């Protein structure tokens, strides 16, 4: 039975995760009155910490593997295990946020991330470090769905686009600071101290959100977990990504192929299996909604390119001692800083020329930038041209991230925790697979050019996906309704 449609959501939101998204005081979402931007600050700090931990070990990775006496391809697990855990756990974390309350789970998740970050800094060997990176990812899996959900609760549609632009900027800032911070700290005092800044900011985020009454702290809504759907989605996502991660490590192709096949079978059974459930974890008809699907595919492609580039470029620059880790981190800095500065501008551009045009422009620019990196990887190192290519890649990512996130939150699927978890799962699955792809191309003779070419192909595939389906209906009179990926 379908509920009545809401002004900013399409009918059917109740069929995801077992409940409808509950407006927080306004018929179109948003708190009563006109809340300022202060409640957003601790949420952005939490977003920053989660993103920072994703790539803080990229630049000093060679120092890490030398310290732990493992190969670079094995050490790449340290990088990709974090987004793998995020991608697997986010849909379930989003569902749980709806059940126990987004604010409560946000604070708990940030504190857990601080604890597991301290554990990672004390890891005695590669196995322990990878395990703590997985725990870091699981701890932070709820942060992004909670933040996006709280933004929709706090801000009405007229201001939600700008809030999501700031959210995208916080994501970019974490990507900006991660490589140079990791390289600088590791070169100065050792790689085990790279998590200390994130712990400090995380404690501030948890304290700020917990103390601010303007951050909605409702108890959540009781709902039953549809175990079959949750298990299929979690197992399918995890097995597909894990199989890609294991390619350079497990030299038995049949093992990897079996894991991948089982993962694909789980996802196919979830998507196409016929089973009447009163409260499905994810209704396949809804998560195939065009607006949500193209936003998720665009975000996946963008993060695949980002994960590939932020891992491959530092390794390329530090090969055979070409550059120190700190210097490599500063070169890579040009990509995320561009992404951070232009994220709010992308929201304005979407309002003026339309979100799908911005998405298409961003993915096209990103594909060209990856091809430029491929060309440079096969020639004599030209740092100025490399920096220009990274800046162009940052421009492309900025033009994708904000409209894709806004489009996901506006769709019926994206108005509940499970849907927000699915969207962010797609993002970090892209990041994990991008890092895994780099491990594959470096497993034997390094083939950096091939790594960037495949990233360009992923961006091109995302571009093709933006032509699927009609535009979503927009609420008249709301400029924010235009700044979406719909």
Question: Where are the regions that the model predicts?
Answer:
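Cytosolic juxtamembrane N-terminal segment immediately preceding the first transmembrane helix
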Residues: 1-52
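12-transmembrane solute porter fold
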Residues: 35-59, 68-94, 103, 110-111, ...
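Membrane-embedded alpha-helical segments in integral membrane proteins
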Residues: 58, 62, 115-122, 172-187, ...
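Helix-terminus/helix-capping segments at the ends of transmembrane helices and short amphipathic helices
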Residues: 62-65, 132, 151-156, 161, ...
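Membrane-embedded alpha-helical segments of multi-pass transporters/permeases
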Residues: 118-122, 206-211, 267-271, 371-375, ...
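Glycine/proline-centered helix-kink
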Residues: 145, 166, 171, 175-183, ...
């Amino acid at each position: 039975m379908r509920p009545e449609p809401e002004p900013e959501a399409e009918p059917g939101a109740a069929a995801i995760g077992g409940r409808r998204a509950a407006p927080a005081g306004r018929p179109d979402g948003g708190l009563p009155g006109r809340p300022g931007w202060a409640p957003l600050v601790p949420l952005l700090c939490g977003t920053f910490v989660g993103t920072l931990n994703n790539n803080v070990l990229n630049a000093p990775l060679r120092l890490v593997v030398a310290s732990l006496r493992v190969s670079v391809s094995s050490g790449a697990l340290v990088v990709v295990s974090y987004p793998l855990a995020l991608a697997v756990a986010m849909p379930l974390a989003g569902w749980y946020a709806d059940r126990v309350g987004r604010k409560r789970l946000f604070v708990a998740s940030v504190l857990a991330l601080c604890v597991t970050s301290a554990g990672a800094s004390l890891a005695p060997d590669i196995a322990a470090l990878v395990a703590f990176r997985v725990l870091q990812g699981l701890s932070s899996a709820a942060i992004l769905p909670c933040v996006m959900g709280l933004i929709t609760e706090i801000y009405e549609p007229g201001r939600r686009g700008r809030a999501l632009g700031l959210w995208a900027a916080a994501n970019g800032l974490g990507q900006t600071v991660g490589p140079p911070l990791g390289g600088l700290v590791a070169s100065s005092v050792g790689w085990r101290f790279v998590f200390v800044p994130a712990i400090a900011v995380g404690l501030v985020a948890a304290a700020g959100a917990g103390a601010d009454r303007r951050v909605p702290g409702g108890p959540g809504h009781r709902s039953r977990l549809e175990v079959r759907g949750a298990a299929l989605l979690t197992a399918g996502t995890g097995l597909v990504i894990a199989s890609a991660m294991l390619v350079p490590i497990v030299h038995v192709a049949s093992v990897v192929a079996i894991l991948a096949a089982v993962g694909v079978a789980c996802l196919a059974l979830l998507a196409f299996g016929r089973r009447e459930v009163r409260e499905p974890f994810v209704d396949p008809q809804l998560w195939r909604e065009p607006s949500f699907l193209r936003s998720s595919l665009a975000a996946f492609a963008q993060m695949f390119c980002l994960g590939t580039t932020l891992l491959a470029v530092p390794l390329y620059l530090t090969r055979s001692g070409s550059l120190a880790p700190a210097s490599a981190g500063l070169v890579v800095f040009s990509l995320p800083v561009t992404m951070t500065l232009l994220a709010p501008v992308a929201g304005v551009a979407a309002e003026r020329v339309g979100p799908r045009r911005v998405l298409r422009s961003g993915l096209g620019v990103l594909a060209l930038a990856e091809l430029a990196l491929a060309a440079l990887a096969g020639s004599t190192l030209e740092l100025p041209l490399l920096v220009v290519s990274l800046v162009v890649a940052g421009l492309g990512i900025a033009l994708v991230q904000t409209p894709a996130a806004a489009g996901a939150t506006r769709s019926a699927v994206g108005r509940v925790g499970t849907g927000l978890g699915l969207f962010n799962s797609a993002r970090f699955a892209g990041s994990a697979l991008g890092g895994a792809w780099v491990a594959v191309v470096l497993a034997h003779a390094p083939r950096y050019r091939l790594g960037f070419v495949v990233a360009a192909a992923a961006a091109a595939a995302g571009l093709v996906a933006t032509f699927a389906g009609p535009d979503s209906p927009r609420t008249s009179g709301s400029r924010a309704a235009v700044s979406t990926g719909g």
